[in-house]
């Protein structure tokens, strides 16, 4: 009598299963030999042409940069892709549009206050446009490139890297718009940057580049405005805002 809910097994299948059981239980049957030990793992090789860093090399570079060792910095947790990255920041500042525009458009002085900027030299200029040679260093790499800058006074400053060896793409845009109506010496600053490293090796430095250069940029220009124009306008805390987006 079949159990309730049981399923009928075809006769051919049942017969085959019974023969298998008789063979496995017969006195002369030999048990299958146990599996042998696994061979020792072969050392992994990394081709230098692939530009992949060993964990030890990542620790050395992180130590040189003064950063804590992290798998997400140059370890295997980071994706091996040369992905374009972007960062944007919007905030109210206690300086006028004209004052902030003057600070940002004065590329010649970047070496005096922009994080990790070692050199800044304007090589040509005409109304609304200029070209500048910049050198930016953040351990363990140094980048020299020409920046093509376009300006709309006092609303916008846009800079594009034209011949860099480190970056495949580097573009920064500053936009200035009116601030709080009741506080005329204020403005809204929108800063955005997008970049992509040329090589996979350098793309692993993206986290450090964000932390050491990009995220400090707006604050550095605000401090420069304080040096040139004095204390900022005092704005009530409830009227302040600061937005950051990163991809």
Curated annotation (Swiss-Prot):
Transit peptide: 1-15
A single Gene Ontology CC term: mitochondrial inner membrane
Gene3D superfamilies for the chain: 3.30.530.20
Places the protein is found: Mitochondrion inner membrane
Classification via InterPro entries: COQ10-like, COQ10_START, START-like_dom_sf
CDD domains in UniProt: COQ10p_like
GO molecular function, one term: ubiquinone binding
UniProt keyword terms in alphabetical order: Membrane, Mitochondrion, Mitochondrion inner membrane, Transit peptide
Family statement drawn from the similarity comment of this UniProt entry: Belongs to the COQ10 family.
Subunit structure: Interacts with coenzyme Q.
Designated name of the protein: Coenzyme Q-binding protein COQ10 homolog A, mitochondrial
Originating species: Homo sapiens (Human)
Gene, per the UniProt record: COQ10A
